[in-house]
Amino acid sequence: MVGGLDIFRERFSQFSDNFVIIGGTACDEILSGTGMRPRATMDIDIVVIVENMTSEFARAFWAFIAEGGYRLGVRKDKDEAPKYVLYSFDHGKVGFPVKVELLSRHNEIFTSAAHTEPLPIDGEVSSLSTIILDEPYYNLTVQNSFVSASLRYAAPLALMALKARAYLNLIADREAGKKINTKDILKHRNDVLKLTATLTGTDRAIVDAEIADTIRAFAEGLLQSLPNQSLQDALRSSEAAIRMFLEALPTYYTARQ
């Protein structure tokens, strides 16, 4: 379990309709009940459900940041107008999550309760935070979420789409000559495949065409890379099993007509 999640749950158990947890913490929640090993993570990434925003949640969040002794994280800024509001806090004190990142579309209720400025993120950052600001991905994540022990998490179908897009973005950036950490690429790749293994025959999502295209491109690219020993080692699976997962992956998403 992610360090500090218990105290986070204590403070926010009544606000499960106000936000969705994404990223590694959501993956950990889903995979912890399976035979697959969750990836270690130290942070909690939160997406605010703007339609359900309340002043009570805003006050509770800022009280938590103060109680945890967090400091404002540093992010790159190109002096461009922010497209959304991002708050990144790290170095939480003992017992709290090491890092908390909150993303929201601009919302006066939330920002007016803050005592610090939001962090604009430029277009070069390939992360779940930037991807989820696209309307189709935001809607998919909110609609495909579940509550477990009083906290709301993104469900596998949403996480897989976010991580497949992040993976493809990072690959494109690397091919364009940008310096990319290979670990970030492998992290998203492996998480998508692990999450695919948790799906059942009834799991389906109606999505915008761009999400269906993303899933198809992700699956086709990895199929072309087989046999892939790195993938087999990471998933502790055979080539045949990985091929089966990749071939099935696009069938879970149907493009909206």
Q: What is each residue range found by the language model?
A:
Residues 1-257:
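Compositionally biased terminal segments of proteins
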